């Protein structure tokens, strides 16, 4: 019965918003926080339902103008990263890596988190995932970026630092 009520609730939410023609960054973010986030929080172990919810969100966003999408890229960063995690947990490597690459494409940069996130353990041996992690390191591993920068002296004394 609970599942039926959730499905009915989601259908109601998605039908109302999908018909909306005046999308802006605020309406996308409000939709995400009211229609996506509660489902994820309540059903965080139901990977199929989570994927379905995220895919509906992405489907709706296909009709949103690019200018609006750029203003709320965090929604897509979170969505694609979490889709990658769900797909990995469900042992669907190709789909997981595809979603992970999309997260990076939209601006995901938390290299340290991706490196230790156990949800991604099933794809760590995938060559595409490893290449994506290398690309991510270039923008998200701040120690690595600092060490590569001109003038960085690894042997410099740090005694005077607080």
Annotate each predicted stretch with a short phrase:
Residues 26-27, 49, 68-75, 110-112:
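Structural signature of alpha-solenoid helical repeat junctions
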Residues 129-159:
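Pro/Ala/Gly-rich low-complexity, hydrophilic intrinsically disordered segments
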């Amino acid at each position: 019965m609970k599942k039926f009520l959730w499905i009915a609730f989601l259908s109601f939410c998605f039908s109302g918003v999908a018909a909306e023609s005046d999308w802006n960054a605020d309406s996308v973010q409000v939709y995400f926080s009211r229609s996506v986030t509660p489902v994820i929080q309540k059903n965080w172990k139901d990977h199929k339902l989570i994927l379905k919810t995220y895919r509906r969100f992405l489907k709706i966003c296909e009709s949103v103008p690019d200018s609006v999408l750029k203003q709320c890229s965090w929604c897509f960063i979170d969505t694609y990263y979490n889709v990658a995690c769900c797909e990995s947990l469900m042992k669907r490597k190709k789909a997981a890596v595809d979603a992970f690459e999309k997260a990076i494409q939209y601006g995901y940069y938390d290299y340290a988190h991706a490196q230790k996130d156990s949800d991604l353990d099933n794809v760590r041996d995938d060559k595409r995932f490893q290449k994506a992690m290398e690309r991510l390191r270039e923008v998200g591993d701040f120690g690595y970026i600092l060490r590569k920068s001109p003038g960085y002296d690894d042997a410099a004394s740090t005694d005077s630092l607080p």
